[in-house]
C-alpha cells in the first residue's frame, strides 16, 4: 500500500511488510525459481552520497511507507543471500495513464499544475508505468543467474530538472504555471512534514 498519510502510518507499515513476507517468503519456501520484488528508489535515497546505485546501503527513513519498503528490502536481501532467486527493482516515482486512483506521483503532478511547481537545483525523476511493466516482464522471462545479490535494478525512467518539467507541464496544460524558487534544504524539509 502506498500511503504517505501519517494517520495510516502503522497500517501502511504492517500491510507492506507483512504482505511482502507472506508473498515473497512463501514463494521462496515453495521453490519458485524466478521471483520479482518491487521495492522503491526511496530505500536508497539518503544524504552523503553523490550518486546512488544498487549497492548503496539502505537508507534510514522515518516515514512509514519508506520505512516499510526499507525493512521489506532488507528481508528480501536476506533471502537473496540465502540463495532465493529474487530479482529486485527500485522504481522512481511511477506515473502513467489509467491510474485507478490518483497515485502519489500523479497526485504530485496535479499539485504542480493546480498550486505550485518548485524550482530548486534538483528535479523530478519518474518512470512511466508501461516502461516499468515492460522491465518486470523482461525480468520474469529472464531469471537471474549466478549471484542473486547482484539481481537488483534501479528503474529510474526520466529525470526532469524543475524548469524543464514546468515547461513540459505548461505545454500539456496550455497555461502558465506558478513556480517558486525554494532552497534545497527547505524543500527536503517540506517533504518530511
Question: Where are the predicted features?
Answer:
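Conserved Rossmann-fold NAD(P)-dependent oxidoreductase catalytic core, especially the SDR/UDP-sugar
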Residues: 9, 18-65, 87
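Glycine-rich "substrate-gating" loop/helix at the edge of Rossmann-like oxidoreductase active sites
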Residues: 61-64, 92-102, 118-130, 144
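NAD(P)H-binding glycine-rich loop region in Rossmannoid oxidoreductase-like domains
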Residues: 1-15
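Substrate-positioning beta->alpha
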Residues: 71, 104, 120-141, 151
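Active-site helix of classical SDR
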Residues: 68
Amino acid at each position: 500500500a502506498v500511503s504517505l498519510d501519517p494517520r495510516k502510518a502503522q497500517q501502511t507499515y504492517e500491510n507492506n511488510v507483512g504482505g511482502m513476507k507472506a508473498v515473497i517468503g512463501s514463494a521462496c519456501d515453495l521453490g519458485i525459481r524466478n521471483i520479482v520484488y518491487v521495492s522503491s528508489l526511496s530505500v536508497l535515497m539518503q544524504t552523503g552520497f553523490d550518486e546512488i546505485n544498487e549497492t548503496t546501503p539502505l537508507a534510514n527513513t522515518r516515514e512509514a511507507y519508506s520505512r516499510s519498503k526499507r525493512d521489506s528490502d532488507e528481508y528480501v536481501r536476506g533471502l537473496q543471500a540465502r540463495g532465493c532467486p529474487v530479482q529486485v527493482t527500485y522504481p522512481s516515482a511511477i506515473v502513467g495513464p489509467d491510474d485507478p486512483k490518483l497515485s502519489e506521483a500523479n497526485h504530485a503532478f496535479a499539485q504542480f499544475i493546480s498550486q505550485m511547481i518548485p524550482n530548486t537545483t534538483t528535479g523530478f525523476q519518474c518512470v512511466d508505468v508501461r516502461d516499468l511493466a515492460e522491465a518486470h516482464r523482461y525480468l520474469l522471462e529472464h531469471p537471474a543467474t549466478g549471484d542473486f545479490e547482484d539481481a537488483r535494478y534501479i528503474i529510474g525512467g526520466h529525470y526532469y530538472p524543475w524548469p524543464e518539467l514546468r515547461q513540459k507541464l505548461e505545454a500539456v496544460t496550455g497555461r502558465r504555471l506558478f513556480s517558486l524558487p525554494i532552497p534545497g534544504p527547505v524543500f527536503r524539509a517540506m517533504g518530511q512534514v
